[in-house]
């Protein structure tokens, strides 16, 4: 793979500033953001007053822990514009979640918010190996989902030539990759696998394309998936993180030179990790639920937003800013099976350790009597024989039991048996409510 290590002068000065300078900037911006939220959002004023804490009580970064949390339910309870801190006419764009489990969560942006967002996405693409003048194939979905437009604006801000393909039409994705010869692709990791499969189906070696960097986000993926992707495509596979409630993509990104955790852009987003049960702030290095406070957002500041993503904070490496470990799962994706907690990424690591199995899998939850059951459905690879598939099925069952301590069902199925997604992959299928 090509060396894309940044050169001196490529980075924003704050990325390598002394930690004391960064912390001073964070405190100044935190105090502004808390005051802005308190003065302009009725929910925050009421919540802070009930907690007995006000903007004047925030004298240090540690004081942030005195403030109450914000959740997705908070945003839905104030649907559609109740969390906005500026007049609606100052909001130049709206995005929203799909709302498949209730009211959508609506987020708004001022012109300055959009400029900041473009800056942090540009910083993320550059960290991942993107450079001015490169062609970037954007296969994130456009529309109310923040991925497509967020990636697009950041790539243009960096100076890339953007191909705004959006998601879907996999054969067309492949044709445009072959015709336009992009250097970078931004897409969900599960859909990248579909693109790679389609390249191979057309007789094209995925290692022979022009792609140098894949920036994958919107769903958790493991280092085993990275190895799979890099071996099959000969491009750097780099993680990007974001969520619409905070800004969209560009909250954090891995850097291509280390690929060992995502640098949080702490000059705009202050991270905490908490115990998901007690809400206690955990020290750096301990795994828990990720919480973010925006430091510069105007239209919709969020204070201590509970992401439900599980990770831990680590010291900076190539940059001053702390890293977050790759997301291991979500508190709401956690499967509790006979008292044992597991997340789909644990299954992914085991699946990818068996060469005759593909990365395409789903976890099916069901109930037999009063007992919850789990069946892992996973596709065999193209060249896998029936005998190898049977052996892989037995081996996967053994490895899962050895790893998590309980037995699960395993069903190795034919290629293309599991639904493909152009967005976030549906890893858990819960049949229990139908019983």
Locate the predicted segments by residue.
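Nucleotide 5′-phosphate-binding alpha/beta core
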Residues: 1-96, 101-119, 123-127, 131, ...
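Conserved S/T- and glycine-rich ATP-binding loop of Class I adenylate-forming
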Residues: 37, 97-100, 136, 185, ...
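AMP-binding/adenylate-forming
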Residues: 111-124, 135-194
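Conserved helix-loop-beta element of the AMP-binding
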Residues: 135, 202-221
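Short, structured coil segments at secondary-structure junctions
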Residues: 158, 180, 210, 232-236, ...
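AMP-binding/adenylate-forming catalytic core of the ANL superfamily
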Residues: 185, 291, 295-404, 423
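Adenylate-forming
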Residues: 192-210, 227-231
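Conserved AMP-binding/adenylate-forming
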Residues: 221-316
